[in-house]
Design a protein with these regions (language model features):
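A generic structural motif
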Residues: 37-39, 118-124, 187, 227-233, ...
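ATP/Mg2+-dependent ligation/transfer catalytic cores
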Residues: 1-211, 253, 401-461
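Short glycine/proline-enriched loop/turn "hinge" motifs that connect secondary-structure elements
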Residues: 102-109, 147, 212-217, 264, ...
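Gly/Pro-rich turn-and-neighbor structural signature
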Residues: 226, 233-239, 245-246, 252-261
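Catalytic-core signal marking the mid-to-C-terminal active-site face
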Residues: 2-6, 14, 26, 246-247, ...
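Histidine-centered divalent-metal-coordination microenvironment in nucleic-acid enzymes
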Residues: 154-168, 214, 218-226, 258-279
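Acidic, His- and aromatic-enriched active-site or binding-groove loops in soluble protein domains
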Residues: 170-197, 230-241, 245, 279-285, ...
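Conserved structured core elements
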Residues: 13, 130, 149, 192, ...
Length: 461
């Protein structure tokens, strides 16, 4: 099976020399230098392409370190060790990862480069999501293994612009479809002009587009991309998520990736993960039951054992947990099954080369770097401790009385803070940093007056 990185010169990717030529010819004049923040958003700067070539490649760029210590609203909040008023909110360094350089076809004459984050002395910013994943990938590399990943990100399309959505309080919006268009060619045809622009835009930015399809919620769709190495997939995911919103906005429409935008089916982000050795042979595949190797069984057992402890990296927001509803295709039971969509972990693949684990817990609001890092950490823990794999769950896991996916962010935070697995895999600094992020999110939610409270209490209480 050909994977994305087997094609060394994907259309849309740029080498440094190609960028120099295009800047000289005037076809590229802007370079976006960006990293992914705690919330999974691209943050950074738009640079003059000339300045990028003359200065930033050699000397890098700077950004305020509060960018990894703010809430969704970009408020400065207390509790972060690495960034605060007491520390003066200084800079960290954006180091261009030149292998990620690509065109941005939906922005005129623009290219984008993903950045790693470092301090002034060159040491990594360990709380950076990309660096967190890189650290887990390095652990795999020490064993001679490579993680291959794919993300399946769902979204809901509205005919309203983002400005119109805000003006209406994000209520009474018009979804781009008025009925369930799951696999519907007729229904998805209504939204094809936008979907095609997104597919072509992503292909022009170096992503390997496989397909698009309708989903269950009104206006809900999914665009699938070819799997690649773990870091590359997460880079692509971040580019896609931002780009899809920008392309929709240019058409006067809006897209939401939030996990549960309304009372219907939520937006998922199923993550597929497999391991390969130095000979590109699947590590998880073998002669055991369901085609698993002993290492594959331990790896999958680790996913189950660590799921509740690491749920914060799979479901980072208050809204994330409202997606876990029985019968909604979002999991509630910490079980695994063979091609069983009612389980948290689904074993899929019809050959040793395609065998992989699908994690069905993350929603569309997930930070992919953190979720994939959590899967690698849990799998390695299972391998190192040689955890036995429980039997595959057959039937409807929604009715299972066993361990459950945490039902609230507060529950997930409690599991995270007491997790030895999280501290051993990521370190105390990362654990405390993201625990504080969850506390900030919970404090904001606890202080909010909701529509539910107003509806029940305005007159009657």
């Amino acid at each position: 099976m050909l994977h994305a990185e087997a094609r060394s010169a994907r259309r849309g990717m740029l080498t440094l020399e190609q960028l120099r030529v295009e800047v000289g010819e005037g076809t590229i004049d802007t370079v976006v230098l960006a990293f992914t923040d705690m919330q999974g958003r691209l943050q950074g700067k738009r640079l003059s392409a000339e300045f990028f070539l003359d200065e930033v490649i050699r000397h890098h760029a700077e950004g305020c370190n509060y960018l990894l210590a703010v809430d969704v609203e970009m408020n400065t909040v207390d509790g972060y060790a690495m960034s605060s008023w007491d520390r003066g909110y200084g800079d960290f360094v954006l180091v261009p990862a030149l292998a990620t350089m690509r065109r941005l076809p939906w922005h005129e004459a623009s290219a984008l480069v993903i950045a790693d984050l470092a301090w002034e002395d060159g040491s990594p910013v360990v709380a950076s999501p990309r660096q967190i994943l890189q650290a887990q990938v390095k652990r795999l590399g020490e064993r001679g293994w490579t993680a291959m990943a794919g993300t399946e990100l769902e979204f809901v399309v509205y005919n309203d612009s983002y400005e119109q959505a805000q003006a209406s309080g994000w209520r009474d919006l018009t979804p781009a479809n008025q009925y369930n268009v799951d696999y519907s060619i007729l229904g998805t045809g209504r939204v094809e002009p936008l979907l095609r622009k997104i597919r072509l835009g992503m292909a022009g930015a170096g992503l390997y587009v496989e397909s698009s399809k309708g989903e269950c919620n009104l206006g809900q769709h999914e665009i699938a991309f070819r799997y690649a190495s773990a870091v590359t997939t997460c880079d692509n995911h971040s580019v896609y998520k931002t780009g899809a919103k920008e392309i929709a906005a240019a058409d006067g429409m809006s897209i939401t990736f939030m996990a549960k935008p309304n009372d219907r089916e939520g937006n998922s982000c199923h993550i597929h993960l497999s391991l390969r050795d130095r000979a590109s042979k699947g590590v998880l595949a073998g002669d055991g039951p369901h085609g698993l190797s002993p290492l594959g069984e331990h790896f999958l057992a680790g996913q189950l054992a660590g799921l509740r402890e690491l749920a914060l990296f799979h479901a980072p927001n208050v809204n994330s947990y409202k997606r876990y509803v029985p019968g909604s295709f979002a999991p509630t039971a910490v079980r695994w099954g063979v091609d069983n969509r009612t389980c948290a972990m689904r074993l899929v693949g019809h050959s040793s080369s395609s065998l992989r684990v699908e994690n069905r817990v993350p929603g569309g609001d997930v930070n992919p770097y953190l979720a994939v890092a959590a899967m690698i950490a849990a799998g390695l823990d299972g391998i190192e401790r040689e955890l036995p794999l429980e039997p595959a769950f057959g039937g409807n896991a929604y009715s299972d009385p066993g361990p459950r996916v945490p039902s609230t962010l507060r529950d997930a935070l409690a599991e995270w803070e007491k997790s030895q697995l999280a501290r051993q895999a990521f370190g105390d600094e990362v654990v405390e940093h993201y625990a504080n992020g969850a506390r900030v999110e919970l404090a904001a939610f606890d202080a909010a007056v909701t529509d539910w409270e107003l509806r029940r209490g305005f007159e009657r209480l």
